[in-house]
């Protein structure tokens, strides 16, 4: 079966796909970070979901080396009460 062609189908190809996903890249590799610090709360909060869960690497694009450091840093920050365990513990 031949592909449909014509003016109508060209317009569809030119429209931006609403399900388009941006190419994932590791923020830490791009920034040249050696070690992720548990005291850097702004960075850690970017990788914690609204329900308090750590966002997986397959969604963020973080490399496994940095994902392990990120998990450890978030868990340390939680233990020291710098970051809440869940969204239920807001002050």
Curated annotation (Swiss-Prot):
Signal peptide: none
UniProt-listed GO biological process terms: translation
InterPro entries linked to this entry: Ribosomal_bS18 (IPR001648), Ribosomal_bS18_CS (IPR018275), Ribosomal_bS18_sf (IPR036870)
Highest taxon of the lineage: Bacteria
Presence of keyword Nucleus: no
Keyword terms of this UniProt record: Ribonucleoprotein, Ribosomal protein, RNA-binding, rRNA-binding
GO molecular function: small ribosomal subunit rRNA binding; structural constituent of ribosome
SUPFAM superfamilies listed in its UniProt record: Ribosomal protein S18 (SSF46911)
Family: Belongs to the bacterial ribosomal protein bS18 family.
Protein's name according to its UniProt entry: Small ribosomal subunit protein bS18
Organism: Paraburkholderia xenovorans (strain LB400)
Gene transcribed to yield this protein: rpsR
């Amino acid at each position: 079966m031949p592909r449909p062609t014509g003016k109508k189908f060209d317009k569809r190809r030119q429209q931006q796909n609403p399900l388009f996903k941006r190419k994932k890249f590791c923020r830490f590799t791009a920034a040249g970070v050696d070690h992720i610090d548990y005291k850097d709360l702004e960075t850690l909060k970017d990788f914690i979901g609204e329900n308090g869960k750590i966002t997986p690497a397959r969604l963020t694009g973080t490399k496994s080396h940095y994902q392990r450091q990120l998990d450890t840093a978030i868990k340390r920050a939680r233990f020291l009460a710098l970051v809440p365990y869940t969204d239920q513990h807001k002050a």
